[in-house]
Amino acid sequence: MSLASGSRTNTFRPLHTAPQLTTPARADAMEAPVQTLTFQRRQTLYHNGDPAQSVFRVRDGLVRITRMTPEGRILTVRHLVPGDFFGEEAFMDGQREEIAEALTTAQIEAIDPALINQQDLMSITRSLSVQMQRSMEYQYHLQTGDLRQRVARYLLTLADTPLARVDAQGRPVISATHELVAEGTASTRESVSKIITELRAEGLIASGYRSITLVDREELDAVAEGF
């Protein structure tokens, strides 16, 4: 099993303007034995080029899959929520093609592909099918609207994931840097910082050290729609 130093051991609000990271209602129990691993926030699960020896499922937390462009930019290509399977390269005895990183503290189930039976395989197939639809929606939103709209959509998407908490005023507080938002919107940190500054000046968000608070979610939704 090729993992980067792992230790053993919400539902998204419907918004037609933002890609939805819907958590499966329940995760079917695997018949194959699983090994549960715990990863801390921003800890890497595996790197590009690592041997693909296990299939994984998110038990708890939020994980992202990234790729690096020839210019050295990191792009987020996939988000994984509880119940999602990933690491399907293990079925082909290949190498990891991407980087998997825990965005929150996460519990991950590692499964030996040689022990997966037909029932487990159907569960994995259903999960990957749902993720493909989600990925298509995510890519659509990356290619429509200007950067201001894309940033607003991404913040709305992250607001109802394990990456966010609710403050005393009931507002979502997202644990995210400008760099993370840039990687999730196919942009640069400098361009995203300018948009964040504008949204803060308009009173739609508040930003602090590695955090962004959604102050006016309704108006931010309007920005995402292009109004």
Q: Model segments located where?
A:
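Polybasic "coupling" helices that flank or enter modular domains
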Residues: L121-R189
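A short beta-strand-loop-beta hairpin characteristic of the jelly-roll/cupin
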Residues: V63-L75
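Cyclic-nucleotide recognition modules
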Residues: R78-Q133, E137
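Phosphate-/nucleic-acid-contacting segments
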Residues: D160-F227
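Cyclic nucleotide-binding regulatory module and flanking cytosolic helices
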Residues: M1-R41, F85-F86, A90-M92
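Short phosphate-coordinating micro-motif centered on Lys-Gly-acidic
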Residues: L45-D50
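Glycine- and acidic-residue-biased ligand/ion/polar-headgroup-sensing regions
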Residues: R42, Q53-T66, P82-G83
